[in-house]
Design a protein with these regions (language model features):
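Glycan-association/targeting regions that enable binding to alpha-glucans and other polysaccharides
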Residues: 1-126, 130-136
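Beta-rich carbohydrate-recognition modules and glycan-binding surfaces
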Residues: 102-289
Length: 289
C-alpha cells in the first residue's frame, strides 16, 4: 500500500514510504523511475529500507527531484519473483515483455511557487458541496475562459429550506503535506472568484476538527486575499449531515484553540442563502501566498 506525495519542492529530498504485507517478508523492495528501460545499459534504482512492521522507506536525493513530474513504481522482490506496483503485475519493469505504463506521480514545482490548494480543471476537483439544514438542488458548470484565463467552476444552489447555508469543502492535506516549508511561510489565503455571493466566508478545518473562517472582502481583479491573521474560530458544520436528524448540525467548541497552519486538513467556503432563490458562486484557483 502506498500513497504518493501530491506536490513537493524541486531540489529537495523526497521521502517515499510504503506498506508491504504478505505471508513472507520480501528480500528487497526497490524504486524504479520512468527513466528505466530493458534496453538501457544502466538502470538506476533506489532500495527501500525496512523501517519496522510492514513499513519500508527510501529517500530520493534532491538531485533527482527536478521541476515537472517525478514518476516511479515500486518492485517487491522475493527469490526469483518480482511484483511491480501500482499495477500489481507479477513482472519487473526491466523484463523485456513488461508493457504496463501505470506509475505513481508526484508533482515537482519551484520552491518559490505559491502553494496551490485548489485548481479548476473539470467539474469535480474533489470539491464537495453541501447544504444545511437539509438539502438543495445544485448544478456545476465548467466555464472555459481561454485563451487569456484559466477555467472557472460555476456552482448554483437552490434550496426550499428556510435560511439555508451552502458549503464547499475540499480535503487538501495530502496535496500540501509535501511542501511544509512553503506552508509555514504562507501569510494569505487567495481566491480567484469571478462571481462572489454575498456573505462569502473562506478558511480551513484543522486536524482538531476546528473551523477557522474569515469574511471575504471585495475582489481586486477577481482575486480575494485574506490574511491568515483574520481567520477566526467558529462552529464546525457536521457534513455530510448528522443522523438522526435531531442531532445538532454543528460542533460548537467550548475551548479556544489558536489557528495553526500546519494542522490544515480541509479548505472550506460557505455562504447563506434565501429559501426558493438561486444562489451562485464562480471560482477558479485557490492558493496560499
Amino acid at each position: 500500500n502506498h500513497s504518493p506525495v501530491g506536490t513537493v519542492d524541486a531540489g529537495k529530498d523526497l521521502t517515499i514510504q510504503a506498506t508491504v504485507a504478505g505471508n513472507e517478508q520480501p528480500d528487497s523492495v526497490i524504486i524504479y523511475t520512468d527513466k528505466i528501460s530493458f534496453w538501457n545499459e544502466k538502470n538506476p534504482s533506489i532500495k527501500m529500507n525496512y523501517a519496522g512492521g510492514y513499513t519500508y522507506r527510501a529517500i530520493v536525493p534532491a538531485s533527482d527531484i527536478k521541476e515537472g513530474c517525478f514518476r516511479y513504481n515500486i518492485v517487491v522482490c522475493r527469490g526469483d519473483k518480482r511484483q511491480t506496483f501500482p499495477s500489481g503485475v507479477a513482472k519487473s519493469p526491466l523484463d523485456w515483455d513488461y508493457t504496463t505504463a501505470t506509475l505513481w506521480e508526484t508533482n515537482v514545482v519551484a520552491s518559490t511557487k505559491p502553494l496551490s490548494l485548489l485548481e479548476v480543471g473539470d467539474t469535480d476537483n474533489n470539491l464537495e458541496v453541501y447544504t444545511l439544514p437539509e438539502w438543495s438542488r445544485t448544478n456545476r458548470e465548467l466555464i472555459e475562459n481561454a485563451p487569456t484565463e484559466r477555467p472557472t467552476l460555476r456552482i448554483t444552489f437552490e434550496s426550499k429550506d428556510p435560511n439555508p447555508v451552502f458549503f464547499l469543502r475540499c480535503y487538501i492535506k495530502d496535496d500540501i503535506s509535501g511542501r511544509p516549508e512553503r506552508l509555514a511561510v504562507g501569510r494569505k489565503l487567495c481566491l480567484h472568484v469571478k462571481k462572489m455571493p454575498e456573505g462569502l466566508k473562506a478558511g480551513f478545518i484543522t486536524s482538531d476538527g476546528y473551523t477557522y473562517l474569515a469574511s471575504c472582502t471585495a475582489a481586486t481583479d477577481d482575486i480575494i486575499r485574506i490574511p491568515l491573521t483574520e481567520l477566526r474560530q467558529t462552529n464546525t458544520a457536521l457534513l455530510p449531515h448528522a443522523y438522526p436528524v435531531f442531532l445538532d448540525n454543528y460542533f460548537r467548541p467550548q475551548t479556544e484553540i489558536p489557528f495553526q497552519v500546519e494542522k490544515i486538513e480541509s479548505l472550506e467556503l460557505s455562504f447563506e442563502g434565501t429559501a426558493g432563490q438561486q444562489a451562485e458562486i464562480e471560482i477558479g484557483g485557490i492558493w496560499l501566498e
